[in-house]
């Protein structure tokens, strides 16, 4: 039984080999049965154990000789299975492989060798061990193995083993290299005939296959039209973007080409001969060669060119004749037809060869004379068709036909007629023969002309058809003659009048008759049109050049003369400079600018003739621009480039600029180049719209304002009104925009002019003191604006100029410069005048720290000027009493009238002041309001208000400021001093924008309340301060103490002291409002600068109130008047600047000066400073420091000296007189309705000054905290501009100023001012609105 098993096994062994391919199916069930799976390593161990098993079996098999070997494997398998099963591995495939490769060999040794890494180099397939991983079967799948695949894997595993053998390594390396070589050959190996096929394709059309619609390909310029046929490029080709082409004679290249072809082809002859070729084909080729041999010999003699092959390809494109190319196409077409008809491949080959041979011969026949055309036609054929070896030619023809099968000749022929690359390349020599022939061979449908064309246009198109037929055989080069261009241009001009659709149809129709495609035709037509336009430009250009050349000699002569004069002047200057250097003169700096001047300018002087010629030229050029299809440039850029490149060179170098040409010809091209966006739109100043509100203000304040300076209140008021020079009538609505005069800011008026204007104003005020009272109330609305203007003027005024003025003038200048502290004149008159000026200026400067000088309304400036002039007149002509009263009246009228009047009354007319005090109390002086506004410290009390109260108008003003001030300053300041310093109170808020509010509020209250005493207003906010002054004109009693100018002065100092000690208790100081007022002013400035709101601001408030009172210590500071009172004030003021408070708040300085100017300017300034010091701890110094502390020192020139303080003080005083002044408005946030009119200042505040505005003058309370730094340097400029603005604003009159204060501002301005004014009105509300 063993035998059969053996046999079965033997017979199955091969099957096993096959089965091994599907071991999974046979033994998969068994494999799954074995639960565990062993990984390769575990399996390797059993495999290693297997070898002993065979060894054991081997001896057993030895007992059985023949069948032993075969059963051995069985036993091996069986024995091997148990271990594998034990190890749960599938080694069954392994046993079959060993028997298969070497069934009859001894398995043990091979297995040992395998396990031992096969030390012997015997056959690699002796034994194979496979590691199989079994997985549990599932219902859907079971493990499957493919024996052949496993065997291959095993062989791969063995390869590294064999690599150990050096011999095997060599063999393997050789095999690897061979494989790599084959791989690269397959990948990169080239086909030898590929190049020739490309050349054959190039023969037909080098450009074939390119996308003609690709914008990158430019076929608009044909090389053959530009380069003669006798020339070719030096190296036989085109190199894009590599420079200029270099040419040489084409005959050489042609001969070289033929010789090259021959030279290259003889070596091929033997190779071809080796091949078997039919005799007929050979004979045909030989015949063709014989015909061409003579030519070949000649080139050989000449020599062979290395670049021949390349040149031949390029020449094909350049020198192809239309006839030869058409013949070639005909030939290829016939060949293609023959190939289609004949199914036998040989027949087409024969036909093709014969046809291929014929064209060369035909070409030769055509060119027996060896003309260029023949050479070019034959030359391209030579490399393919002409050869000494027929067989080679046959192969070439065969390849060519294969390639031609890929060509759509119908499409090529159509393209030829359409001006396709074929036609373009074929007709590059200028031939139209090709398109004509193509149309004959393959008739093409010509697009019909659109209907409805003009008769003339159709006629010209017909002319073009006829001309095209005449030129058909001459090529494109000769096609576009002058006549043809004229026809085309005429057609183009007529087409320009038609629509784009019709134009396109006509172009499509014309395309069939011209040797170019539609796109090229359109480009050519446009180019012709532009050329004609350029021709039209030549004549006008020539005329212009002629005209310029005629005019230039004279201008050049003048220029040379100027140069000579300049040189002479330079020489003279040089000599003088040397002398000055020797003398050590200081004028060298002045001469330096002259030295920098290079020379006279080359400025061309236009005349009408040249301008007309230029315009004509530009008109023609604009016509060209309109013809541009794609306007890549704007008309402006187009013209400018034309002028730069074409027109400008007509002038000598340096004599003309393109921008001048553009400007001179603007009349012609303005419709195209005047885009609104390019124009610089300079917004016009806003119209003055505030007349109504000023009028209302005027009405209310008119009654309440008591003429301070006038003998009687009514007289003062009237005087003020008249002094205002019809300020009430003149009360134009002052727009914030208009209020700031740009020119004034940039060109500040001279101090002298300002002082003169102020003097005039003062003189005017003298007459109508009583009337001024009413005028001032009327001007209430304007006080803000006027004050702003005054502040502007103050900023422009030089700091020290007031000192230079006479005592009277000094008083005025001081008042103008009130913002800058300065000594106040001692004389009551001087004090009064000074007070007026200072009141006007100081109030406004203090009030509007943020307001630029420019913002002040022109009317305010005028009023300021009038007041200053009046003040001058009064101070110079009147005694202390009369001049003071007049000045006060004038000041009152301008600054609300009351302020100035108060200043004067304390000095000379204490009784008058008392009389007016009732009115003034009701009336809030703009200056006072301004000061309060500038004062950021709400603590400042209304002590100054009592001072104002000294003069009835002033007292009223003080009251209002007090009221406003009280709200603003009530929280910060003590209530005690508020009563007396209602103005100061207000000033304190004014630091927080209370000044503006005060001024406005006072003005508005005066106007609205019928001049309820400012104290009454102040009383409501801060009744405790000075209820009487605020509520009623009773503060007049305070002025009464100053009934006599001297007592008034003394009272003023006392009042100032009181203010310093207490702002509130100064209701009585109100009795000497002048002195209190100056103190208030000083305090106010200092308060703006410092944090002490109560004491300093009270005095600041007073000043602001007393701004109407022109008695401003600032005057003393400014002019340093000799008057004892003024001197006292200046000294204190000086202290203030020295402390640096002046620098921080010129307002403080101003405030002091203003009080001094008023009743008893000197005393008041002293008191003022005392008040300030009381607030700060030391007179003026204290006041100044507080100002600097609380705010960015409202005055930029805080560091400026007493002189600066004096100036600012004078300015403040003047501003105070001009109630409209609202310089401090910006800081103010109007809290009270009354203050709202003063809010105008706020509106002004936004205005920026061209120059640094000394903040000390403006007294920017809260807002200007950081401004202090600029005070010193800017004070002079500020005074200047401020004076100018002040004069402007004040000229209209106090009434106008008052009206300005109340005048409603533009909405945005009003809002700003309202915010500022409210803050001013309520000391507690420091610029809350803002």
Curated annotation (Swiss-Prot):
Alphabetized UniProt keyword annotations: Acetylation, Isopeptide bond, Phosphoprotein, Ubl conjugation
Entry keyword annotation includes rRNA-binding: no
Biased amino acid composition, Polar residues: 345-356, 807-816, 896-913, 938-956, 1082-1148, 1158-1169, 1308-1317
Annotated spans, Disordered: 1-133, 249-304, 336-356, 574-597, 672-730, 802-833, 864-913, 938-988, 1017-1201, 1308-1330
Chain positions found as Phosphothreonine: 244, 253
Listed GO biological process terms: chromatin organization
Keyword Secreted in annotation: no
InterPro entries: HRD, UBN_middle_dom
Record field: compositional bias (Low complexity): 701-730, 864-895, 1017-1029, 1045-1054, 1061-1079
Residue list for modification Phosphoserine: 13, 251, 312, 417, 420, 423, 585, 1107
GO (cellular component) term, any one: nucleus
Covalent link (Glycyl lysine isopeptide (Lys-Gly) (interchain with G-Cter in SUMO2)) residue numbers: 273
Post-translational modification N6-acetyllysine, affected residues: 1052, 1132
Similarity comment: family membership: Belongs to the ubinuclein family.
Name assigned to this protein: Ubinuclein-2
Organism: Bos taurus
Classification of source organism: Eukaryota, Metazoa, Chordata, Craniata, Vertebrata
């Amino acid at each position: 039984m063993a035998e059969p098993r053996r046999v079965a096994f033997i017979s199955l062994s091969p099957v096993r080999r096959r089965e091994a391919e599907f071991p999974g199916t046979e033994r998969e069930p068994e494999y799954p049965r074995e639960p565990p799976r062993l990984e390769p390593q575990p399996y390797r161990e059993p495999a290693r154990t297997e070898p002993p098993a065979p060894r054991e079996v081997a001896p057993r098999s030895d007992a059985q000789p023949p069948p032993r070997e075969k059963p051995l494997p069985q036993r091996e398998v069986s024995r091997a299975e148990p271990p594998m099963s034990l190890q749960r591995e599938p080694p069954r495939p392994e046993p079959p492989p060993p028997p298969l490769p070497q069934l009859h060999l001894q398995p043990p040794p091979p297995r040992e060798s395998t396990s031992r890494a096969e030390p012997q180099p015997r056959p690699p397939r002796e034994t194979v061990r496979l590691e199989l991983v079994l997985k549990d079967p599932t219902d859907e799948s079971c493990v499957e193995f493919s024996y052949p695949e496993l065997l291959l894997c095993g062989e791969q595993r063995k390869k590294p083993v064999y690599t150990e053998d050096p011999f095997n390594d060599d063999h393997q390396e050789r095999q690897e290299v061979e494989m790599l070589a084959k791989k690269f050959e397959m990948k990169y190996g080239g086909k030898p005939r590929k190049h020739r096929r490309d050349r054959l394709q190039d023969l037909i059309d080098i450009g074939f296959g390119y996308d003609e619609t690709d914008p990158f390909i430019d076929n608009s310029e044909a090389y053959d039209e530009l380069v003669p046929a006798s020339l070719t490029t030096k190296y036989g080709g085109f190199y894009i973007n590599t420079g200029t082409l270099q040419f040489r004679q084409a005959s050489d290249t042609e001969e070289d080409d033929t010789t090259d072809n021959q030279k290259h082809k003889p070596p091929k002859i033997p190779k071809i001969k080796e091949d078997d070729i039919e005799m007929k084909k050979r004979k045909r080729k030989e015949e063709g060669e014989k015909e061409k041999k003579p030519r070949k010999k000649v080139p050989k003699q000449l020599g062979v060119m290395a670049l021949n092959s390349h040149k031949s390809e390029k020449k094909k494109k350049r020198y192809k004749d239309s006839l030869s190319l058409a013949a070639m196409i005909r030939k290829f077409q016939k060949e293609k037809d023959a190939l289609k008809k004949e199914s036998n491949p040989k027949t087409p080959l024969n036909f093709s060869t014969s046809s291929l041979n014929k064209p060369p011969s035909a070409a030769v026949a055509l060119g027996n004379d060896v003309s260029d055309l023949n050479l070019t036609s034959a030359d391209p054929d030579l490399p393919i068709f002409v050869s000494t070896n027929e067989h080679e030619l046959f192969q070439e023809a065969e390849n060519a036909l294969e390639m031609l099968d890929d060509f759509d000749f119908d499409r090529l022929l159509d393209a030829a007629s359409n001006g396709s690359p074929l036609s373009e390349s074929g007709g590059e020599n200028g031939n139209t023969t090709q398109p004509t022939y193509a149309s004959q061979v393959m008739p093409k449908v010509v697009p019909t002309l659109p209907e409805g064309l003009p008769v003339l246009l159709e006629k010209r198109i017909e002319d073009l058809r006829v001309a095209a037929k005449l030129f058909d055989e001459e090529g494109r080069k000769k096609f576009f003659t002058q006549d043809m261009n004229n026809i085309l241009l005429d057609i183009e001009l007529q087409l320009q009048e038609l629509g784009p659709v019709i134009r396109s149809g006509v172009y499509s129709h014309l395309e069939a008759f011209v040797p170019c495609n539609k796109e090229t035709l359109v480009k050519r037509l446009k180019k012709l049109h532009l050329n004609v336009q350029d021709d039209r430009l030549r004549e006008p250009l020539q005329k212009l050049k002629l005209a310029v050349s005629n005019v230039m000699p004279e201008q050049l002569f003048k220029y040379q003369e100027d140069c000579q004069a300049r040189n002479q002047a330079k020489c003279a200057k040089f000599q003088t400079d040397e002398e000055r250097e020797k003398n050590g003169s200081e004028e060298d700096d002045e001469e330096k600018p002259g030295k920098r001047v290079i020379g006279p300018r080359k400025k061309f002087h236009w005349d009408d003739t040249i301008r007309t010629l230029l315009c004509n030229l530009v008109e023609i050029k604009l016509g060209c621009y309109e013809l541009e299809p794609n306007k890549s440039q704007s008309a402006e850029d187009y013209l400018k480039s034309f002028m730069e490149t074409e027109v400008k060179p007509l002038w000598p170098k340096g004599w003309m600029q393109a921008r001048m040409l553009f400007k001179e010809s603007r009349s012609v091209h303005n419709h195209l180049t005047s885009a609104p966006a390019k124009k610089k739109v300079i917004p016009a100043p806003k119209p003055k719209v505030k007349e109504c509100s000023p009028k209302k203000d005027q009405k209310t304040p008119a009654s309440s304002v008591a003429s301070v300076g006038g003998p009687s209140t009514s007289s003062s008021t009237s005087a003020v009104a008249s002094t205002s020079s019809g300020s009430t009538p003149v009360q134009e609505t002052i727009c914030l925009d208009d209020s700031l005069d740009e020119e004034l800011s940039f060109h500040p008026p001279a101090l002298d002019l300002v002082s003169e204007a102020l003097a005039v104003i003062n003189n005017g005020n003298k007459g109508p003191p009583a009337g001024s009272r009413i005028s001032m109330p009327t001007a209430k609305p304007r006080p803000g604006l006027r004050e702003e203007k005054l502040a502007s003027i103050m900023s422009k005024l030089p700091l020290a100029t007031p000192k230079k003025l006479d005592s009277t003038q000094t008083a005025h200048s001081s008042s103008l410069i009130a913002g800058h502290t300065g000594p106040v004149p001692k004389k009551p008159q001087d004090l009064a005048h000074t007070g007026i000026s200072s009141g006007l200026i100081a109030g406004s400067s203090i009030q509007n720290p943020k307001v630029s000088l420019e913002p002040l309304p022109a009317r305010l400036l005028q009023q300021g000027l009038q007041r200053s002039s009046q003040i001058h007149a009064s101070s110079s002509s009147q005694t202390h009493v009369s001049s003071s009263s007049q000045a006060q009246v004038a000041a009152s009228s301008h600054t609300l009238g009351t302020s100035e009047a108060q200043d004067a009354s304390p000095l000379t007319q204490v009784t008058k002041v008392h009389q007016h005090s009732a009115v003034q109390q009701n009336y809030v002086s703009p200056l006072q309001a301004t000061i309060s506004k500038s004062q950021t410290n709400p603590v400042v009390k209304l002590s100054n208000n009592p001072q104002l109260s000294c003069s009835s108008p002033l007292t009223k003003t003080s009251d209002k400021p007090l009221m406003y001030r009280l709200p603003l300053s009530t929280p910060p300041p003590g209530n005690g001093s508020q009563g007396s310093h209602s103005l100061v109170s207000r000033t304190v808020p004014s630091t927080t924008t209370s000044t503006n509010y005060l001024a406005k509020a006072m003005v508005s209250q005066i106007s609205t309340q019928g001049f309820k005493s400012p104290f009454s207003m102040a009383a409501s906010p801060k009744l405790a301060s000075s209820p009487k002054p605020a509520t009623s004109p009773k503060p007049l009693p305070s002025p009464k103490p100053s009934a006599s100018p001297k007592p008034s002065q003394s009272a003023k100092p006392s009042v100032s002291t009181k203010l310093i000690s207490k702002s509130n208790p100064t209701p009585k100081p109100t009795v000497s409002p002048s002195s209190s007022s100056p103190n208030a002013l000083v305090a106010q400035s200092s308060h703006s600068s410092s944090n002490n709101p109560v004491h300093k601001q009270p005095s600041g408030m007073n000043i602001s109130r007393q701004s109407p009172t022109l008695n401003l210590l600032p005057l003393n500071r400014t002019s340093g008047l000799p008057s004892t009172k003024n001197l006292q004030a200046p000294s204190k003021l000086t202290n203030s600047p020295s402390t640096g408070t002046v620098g921080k708040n010129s307002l403080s300085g101003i405030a002091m000066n203003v009080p001094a100017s008023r009743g008893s300017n000197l005393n008041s300034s002293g008191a003022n400073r005392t008040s300030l010091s009381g607030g700060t701890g030391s007179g003026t110094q204290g006041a100044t420091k507080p100002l600097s502390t609380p705010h960015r020192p409202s005055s930029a020139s805080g560091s400026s000296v007493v002189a600066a303080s004096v100036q600012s003080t004078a300015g403040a005083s003047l501003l105070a007189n001009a109630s409209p002044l609202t310089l401090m408005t910006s800081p103010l946030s109007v809290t009270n309705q009354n203050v709202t009119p003063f809010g105008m200042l706020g509106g002004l505040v936004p205005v920026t000054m061209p120059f640094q505005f000394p903040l000390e003058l403006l007294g920017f309370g809260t807002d200007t905290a950081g401004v202090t730094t600029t005070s010193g340097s800017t004070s002079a400029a500020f005074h200047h501009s401020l004076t100018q603005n002040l004069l402007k604003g004040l000229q209209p009159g106090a009434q106008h100023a008052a009206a300005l204060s109340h005048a409603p501002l533009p909405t945005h301005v009003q809002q700003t001012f309202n915010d500022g004014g409210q803050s001013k009105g309520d000391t507690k509300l420091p610029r809350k609105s803002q």
